[in-house]
Amino acid sequence: MHKRSLGGLALATVVTIAAGAPLAAQRLRAVEAGVGGALTVARHTMAGVEVGAGYRPGGQSRIALALDAGSEDGQAAARAQLTAQFLVTPNARRGTGVYGGIGVAVAGRRRSPGRGYLALLLGLEAAPGRRGGWYAELGLAGGARLAAGWRGRWFQP
């Protein structure tokens, strides 16, 4: 009886380890780059272009940096946002993926001091498990922010 228990335990251990290997292989790591437009509506409205970069270490997380440059009340303005994001379906190769994020943002314009904010966002993106596609974000960071564009992804083994 004792040998059977040990044999069953060994078999269960092997099955558990073997089942975990495909799961680890499905964890997509990626480097991302994007370009688009951004609009921030607050006391002053800023409209401009956005460039972004992101890193997905695997699982459901992404670290993203977005840099916006444009115009606010006729003055040159810039904005930077760094967020930690949670992707609901990071491996989806079809359909739309949903993600949310929290982080920090800093915004400034010519002849005016910069301002720092807590940043919250909710986003949609085309098939996050594919090499690229559109994205759209709605966020709060010193006002309402809308951004949309195209994001490319380079997956790593």
Regions found by a protein language model. Give the residues of each.
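Cleavable N-terminal export/targeting peptides
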Residues: 1-28, 157
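Short glycine/proline- and aromatic-enriched beta-strand/turn motifs that initiate or cap beta-hairpins
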Residues: 21-79, 86, 151-157
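A generic structural micro-environment signature
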Residues: 7, 12-17, 41, 45, ...
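Glycine-centered flexibility sites
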Residues: 36, 48, 101-105, 123, ...
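Predominantly the C-terminal beta-signal and adjacent terminal strand-loop region
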Residues: 60-63, 115-157
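Gram-negative (and chloroplast) outer-membrane scaffold detector with strong preference
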Residues: 52-115, 119-128
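Residues that cap or initiate secondary-structure elements
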Residues: 41, 90-92, 108-110, 142, ...
